[in-house]
């Protein structure tokens, strides 16, 4: 960033100016202007790269809805874990929720142990019983490709025959504990981990997805990962980031839904094409 445009004034010259000459400061100024213009052009290009027209995004009764040609094309979802406790899934469905993303498990951020979410099976049974489609997400703390593959296999065992039709999500976030085992991994390593996970999930016939907010995604070489993006940014207007095109957006962590006693994360899926056949 250029913080000052002041330049020292040179002493008067005894030589006459050449009418066709260009002084060095002028050349430098021209170069600076060109660089600024280039960055402005890139910024404008990045700001317009999203494929969505946010004027078609509406907040209706606390829920985000996306329209195309006057028709609602999005679906409304929630994501839950054992933090929400026992859920009345019939009440959830009756409240207009179209799908759910269930946390199926996590890896410990310090010791690296794999855990199944305490309410996972209860949530699977409840959502299935009322006919509410769902996907799953796993909180990864893998430090290498081998551990990422281990996580993918762990999930595939959990969801085998469970009727998952929505994406299987790789959720890698740094933890506040300074001893977090994956906090200081390089972008290359984090990317390789995500690639390994998503490739295995896709091989098994499910739709892989990567979750993150602006910071989480910036830690990855996201364009090298063959997976959809579930983006997190809490606002009641529209996403402000154009970091990457995403197909699902987590827009609130304080949602109110019948059948759930706590606040809950609210999500919108923009395109139904990301739903896979039941397995």
Regions found by a protein language model. Name each.
Residues 15-35:
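N-terminal Sec-pathway targeting helices
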Residues 201-218:
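Aromatic-lined carbohydrate-recognition surfaces of secreted/lumenal glycan-active proteins
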Residues 52-90, 224-279:
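Functionally critical loop-and-helix segments that line ligand-binding/catalytic clefts
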């Amino acid at each position: 960033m250029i913080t000052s445009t002041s330049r020292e004034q040179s002493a008067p010259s005894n030589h006459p100016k050449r009418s066709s000459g260009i002084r060095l400061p002028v050349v430098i100024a021209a170069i600076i202007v060109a660089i600024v213009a280039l960055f402005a052009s890139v910024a404008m290009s990045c700001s317009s790269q999203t494929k969505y027209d946010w004027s078609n995004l509406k907040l209706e009764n606390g829920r985000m809805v996306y329209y195309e040609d006057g028709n609602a094309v999005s679906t409304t979802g929630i994501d839950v874990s054992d933090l929400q406790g026992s859920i009345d899934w019939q009440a959830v469905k009756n409240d207009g929720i179209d799908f759910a993303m269930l946390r199926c498990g996590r890896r410990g951020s310090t010791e690296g142990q794999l855990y199944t979410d305490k309410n996972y099976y209860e949530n699977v049974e409840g959502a299935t019983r009322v006919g509410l489609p769902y996907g799953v997400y796993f909180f990864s703390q893998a430090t290498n490709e081998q551990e990422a593959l281990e996580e993918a296999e762990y999930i595939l065992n959990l969801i085998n025959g469970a009727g998952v039709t929505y994406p299987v999500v790789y959720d890698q976030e740094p933890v506040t504990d300074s001893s977090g085992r994956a906090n200081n991994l390089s972008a290359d390593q984090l990317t390789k981990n995500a690639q390994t996970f998503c490739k295995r999930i896709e091989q098994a016939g499910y739709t892989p997805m990567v979750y993150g907010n602006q910071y989480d995604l910036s830690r990855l070489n996201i364009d090298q990962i063959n997976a959809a993006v579930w983006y997190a940014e809490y606002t009641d207007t529209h996403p402000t980031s154009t970091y990457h095109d995403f197909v699902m957006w987590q827009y609130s962590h304080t949602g109110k839904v019948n059948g759930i006693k706590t606040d809950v994360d609210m999500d919108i899926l923009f395109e139904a094409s990301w739903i896979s056949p039941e397995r």
